[in-house]
């Protein structure tokens, strides 16, 4: 089933709730506006933002590129969105959650309502202690957020969403680019790691490219018991037979 009319759910009340769900001390985006500054005159700001979104006049700002150091010493690029972009993104995430929570599989734990890292670890622990598994494959999709194919992201969103206004919003965020040291650059692939919308898009993408494939593989190809736990782009399949896990490595 596709949903053809969704934008009307993006109300001022939803935008207000989205604003107050944001981190108060988060770094500002390219416009330099902090959460506290945006809260000043909030109702007028939200009325204006709501109007621009529904008139098609809303423009997504580029993300501000920052880097954090990874455990191995390499730099991980993050994209810091402007407050207004975060508000609209969170509102759209809330709407999309109502649709995709009906679709997402049980072994997906990352960035979902009512689910957490602790639950993923509990599922992993339970499988190791209670299930008949002897091997564990710890898989991480390399540079996943940076390398996402934008056209396929849109195609996967379109499986359930047929409201062109929602699709245009997603396209605006994917194509907003990044600002680094005052210079704008286009992002030909990927979605900014650190943005509000990215985890939702990642889960939709992986639902169709990984989760559904794993379900078929587990039922038709695997010999013995196979348990899968996925948290965003990290997964940990566990099985009784090593050769079955080695065949699953081809996916990653």
Please report, for each region that a protein language model flagged, where it lies by residue.
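Surface-exposed loop/turn segments and immediately adjacent short secondary-structure elements
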Residues: 1-55
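Glutamine-centric residue-chemistry signal
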Residues: 75, 89-90, 193
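Duplex nucleic acid-engaging cores and interfaces of nucleic-acid transaction enzymes
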Residues: 84, 88-93, 135
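Conserved phosphate-binding loops in nucleotide/dinucleotide-binding enzymes
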Residues: 77-78, 82
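Short, compositionally biased low-complexity segments
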Residues: 9-27, 63-67, 93-99, 177
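Residue-level detector of well-ordered alpha-helical segments, enriched
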Residues: 2, 14, 18, 45, ...
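Electropositive, glycine- and tryptophan-enriched low-complexity nucleic-acid-binding patches
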Residues: 90, 94-109
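Conserved polymerase palm-domain catalytic core
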Residues: 45-48, 52-66, 71, 103-115, ...
């Amino acid at each position: 089933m596709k949903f053809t009319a969704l934008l009307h759910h993006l109300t001022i009340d939803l935008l207000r709730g989205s604003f107050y769900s944001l981190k108060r001390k988060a770094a500002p985006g390219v416009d330099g506006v902090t959460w506290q500054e945006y809260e000043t005159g909030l109702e007028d700001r939200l009325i204006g933002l709501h109007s621009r979104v529904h008139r098609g006049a809303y423009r997504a700002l580029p993300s501000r590129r920052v880097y954090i150091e990874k455990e191995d010493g390499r730099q991980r690029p993050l994209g810091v969105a402007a407050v207004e972009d975060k508000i609209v993104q969170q509102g759209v995430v809330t709407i999309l959650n109502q649709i995709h929570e009906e679709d997402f599989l049980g072994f997906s734990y990352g960035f979902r309502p009512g689910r957490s890292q602790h639950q993923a670890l509990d599922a992993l622990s339970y499988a190791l202690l209670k299930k008949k598994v002897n091997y564990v494959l710890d898989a991480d999709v390399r540079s996943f957020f940076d390398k996402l194919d934008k056209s396929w992201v849109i195609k996967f969103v379109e499986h359930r969403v047929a409201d062109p206004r929602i699709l245009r919003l997603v396209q605006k965020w994917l194509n907003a680019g990044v600002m680094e040291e005052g210079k704008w650059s286009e992002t030909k692939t990927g979605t900014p790691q650190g943005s509000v919308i990215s985890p939702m898009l990642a889960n939709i993408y992986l639902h169709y490219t990984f989760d559904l494939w794993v379900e078929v593989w587990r039922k038709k190809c695997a010999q013995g018991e196979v348990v899968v736990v996925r948290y965003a782009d990290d997964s940990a399949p566990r099985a009784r037979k090593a050769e079955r896990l080695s065949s699953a490595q081809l996916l990653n």
